[in-house]
Amino acid sequence: MKTLYIHIGCPKTATTSIQYFCNENKEILSKNGIYFPIFEQKYKDVNPYRNGHFLIAHQYDSNGKINTLDEHRIFRFNMDHIIYMFSKYNNILLSDESIWHSTHFFKKDLWEILRKESLKR
């Protein structure tokens, strides 16, 4: 069974430490069938090991307006990578401490979006 684990990391629960630990131990995780991806997209003031940030992050254009086309492009690119990596791994781990909050406010449909993505495999 293929599983996408999403660590939603509530504040002050050592989420950053978990993310650094997963990155530092990627090879060990990999040998045990767990893939912890680091994506090319970087976000200002966001540590690069918050690999689930693309699930909830806004993208902005040069005028400071939300760029939904760019958001969809990055989401699609990263989800396609995840779907591909399921051909090599049974378990994929994403982590971001903003997911717990975002799913209650501006990204309420995230779980439904991910459920639909799971049907594409």
PLM regions and their residue ranges:
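PAPS-dependent sulfotransferase catalytic core
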Residues: 1-100
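Well-ordered, non-membrane alpha-helical segments in soluble/globular domains
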Residues: 72-80, 105-115
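Conserved phosphate-donor/acceptor-positioning beta-strand/loop module used by diverse small-molecule
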Residues: 119-121
